[in-house]
Design a protein with these regions (language model features):
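Conserved catalytic core of the tyrosine transesterase superfamily
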Residues: 1-295
Length: 295
């Protein structure tokens, strides 16, 4: 099945122009499925609907993956087999008419403004890494960028004079997001002092660098933000998307309109942004129940 996987990845890269993170996710899903087939000595051309359903059940029950993740795996398999129908003359797509598990709608967690303030105060700005980390956290909260967008920023993406950052999001769509005073100040300090120290005489277009003077990876940033979350004693595992959720929720709490928040987040569909209005409703209910005498 390896040759089919390679052909498919090449197709989504060259023909569809999917982002490298999407390519990696597709490859991981397919490599795992290939091991499942190898254990049963089944070729890709021999996969049936029943076998696909069996695999999904295994992911849910044995590997304890959540319904949303399993649904994403099914999309990967459906696209892969549809490619084989056209490219390898497969008779039919075994994933057609296979329904994924129903995902329960859970509202994303958000930090309070006080929790964000506590988090942003953690980096030691007297040190090289602290200046960098302070700038990254400030920019992440100021813009609501995805972590992949943040780590892919180049120096020229920042316009300090006009106060905005340009990024490229999902599907290669470019957008411009404003930067607040705190983020601009942290960036200025980082660029003037910390980044030069990290470069160690080398040159790089990437905005945020690791200790080798190279582009900071998503995984590297996850470790950094997780460590600061534990240090701030926030009480929940701190992941980069938590600041993105907090960014959107805090804007709406202060009267921002949904369409503007959608544009800043880079959502193609406003229904994706509307999840944050549900968070506000839940928060209002909590406040009411805690403080109203007849709640």
């Amino acid at each position: 099945m390896q040759s089919e996987i390679s052909s498919f990845i090449n197709y989504i890269t060259v023909e569809q122009g999917l982002a490298s993170n999407t390519q990696s996710a597709y490859r991981r899903d397919l490599e795992t499925f290939a091991k499942f087939l190898d254990a049963r000595k089944v070729q890709a051309s021999e996969v049936s609907r029943e076998l696909v359903r069996e695999y999904l059940v295994e992911l849910l029950q044995d590997r304890k993956l959540n319904a949303r993740t399993v649904g994403r795996v099914l999309v990967t398999l459906r696209n892969f087999f549809q490619f084989l129908v056209f490219d390898r003359d497969l008779c039919e797509n075994p994933c057609l008419n296979v329904e994924g598990p129903k995902a329960t709608k859970t509202l994303p967690k958000v930090l309070s403004v006080n929790q964000v303030d506590e988090l942003l105060s953690q980096p030691d700005v007297t040190k090289t890494y602290g200046l960098r980390d302070k700038a990254m956290l400030e920019v992440l909260y100021a813009t609501g960028l995805r972590v992949s967008e943040l780590t892919s920023l180049e120096v020229q993406a920042v316009n300090s004079d006009l106060g905005y950052v340009s990024c490229v999001g999902k599907g290669g769509k470019a957008r411009v997001v404003p930067l607040g005073r705190s983020a601009l100040s942290a960036l200025e300090s980082y660029l003037r002092h910390s980044r030069l120290a990290l470069l160690k005489g080398k040159t790089s277009n990437w905005l945020f660098l690791n200790r080798h003077g190279e582009k900071l990876t998503r995984q590297g940033f996850w470790k950094i933000i997780g460590a600061y979350g534990r240090k701030a004693q926030i009480g929940i595992p701190l992941k980069p998307h938590l600041l993105r959720h907090s960014f959107a929720t805090h804007l709406l709490q202060r009267g921002a309109d949904l369409r503007s928040v959608q544009m800043m987040l880079g959502h193609s569909d406003i229904s994706t942004t509307q999840i944050y209005t549900h968070i506000l409703k839940e928060r209002l209910r909590e406040i009411y129940e805690q403080h109203h005498p007849r709640s």
